[in-house]
């Protein structure tokens, strides 16, 4: 996928639903994993482009909670691909001033991947050109449910009164509490669905579906 955001108003927070890797591979008679490998190259270009044109926050829908239903071989490959991307791109992220963060549930993710992501987050946390959020093992409903459970727990422990619960308080319990609402959500592949992406933070977002495959 190639994007040219320089000709439109630059969003502060851009979310991308990266769709179409499998179809890209199928059209070329290749296995699905070839599409995922090609998709990583699109990620690299997109991160560089966003850093260059002034996008401050980029959230990529990397692996949804629903993706666990895919064949185990494909899931295992995607986890390894996430590890390889993080390790290989870390020098470039540092060079471009990119801060990398995991956005999603840690439960069920490989320990090796979590270790790599944690180290990358620590090494890049001082970077301020672009915040790159990998929505990995992420689902909008799961995020809201986890926030609700944490709020109930704090209330039961006497740390939070019902009168204190408002939108700002609720947002504080989401995966990345300081993350602002998303301004623009781009979905490649032609589908016109949010697919459980950034449900709480997409209240006022513009949605743009592109026919091009990721």
Predicted regions and their residues:
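Flexible, compositionally biased loop and terminal segments
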Residues: 1-214
């Amino acid at each position: 996928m190639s994007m040219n955001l320089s000709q439109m108003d630059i969003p502060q927070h851009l979310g991308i639903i990266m769709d179409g890797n499998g179809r890209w591979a199928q059209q070329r008679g290749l296995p699905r994993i070839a599409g995922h490998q090609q998709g990583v190259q699109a990620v690299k270009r997109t991160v560089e482009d966003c850093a260059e044109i002034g996008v401050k926050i980029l959230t990529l829908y990397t692996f949804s909670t629903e993706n666990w239903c895919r064949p185990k071989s494909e899931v295992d490959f995607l986890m390894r691909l996430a590890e390889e991307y993080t390790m290989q791109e870390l020098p470039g992220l540092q060079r471009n001033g990119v801060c990398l963060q995991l956005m999603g549930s840690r439960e069920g993710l490989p320990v090796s991947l979590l270790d790599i992501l944690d180290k990358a987050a620590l090494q890049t946390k001082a970077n301020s050109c672009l915040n790159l959020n990998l929505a990995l093992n992420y689902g909008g409903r799961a995020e809201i449910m986890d926030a609700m459970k944490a709020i109930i727990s704090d209330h039961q422990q006497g740390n939070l009164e019902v009168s204190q619960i408002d939108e700002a308080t609720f947002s504080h319990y989401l995966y990345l509490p300081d993350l602002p609402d998303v301004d623009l959500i781009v979905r490649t592949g032609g589908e016109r669905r949010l697919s459980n992406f950034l449900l709480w933070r997409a209240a006022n977002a513009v949605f743009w579906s592109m026919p091009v495959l990721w």
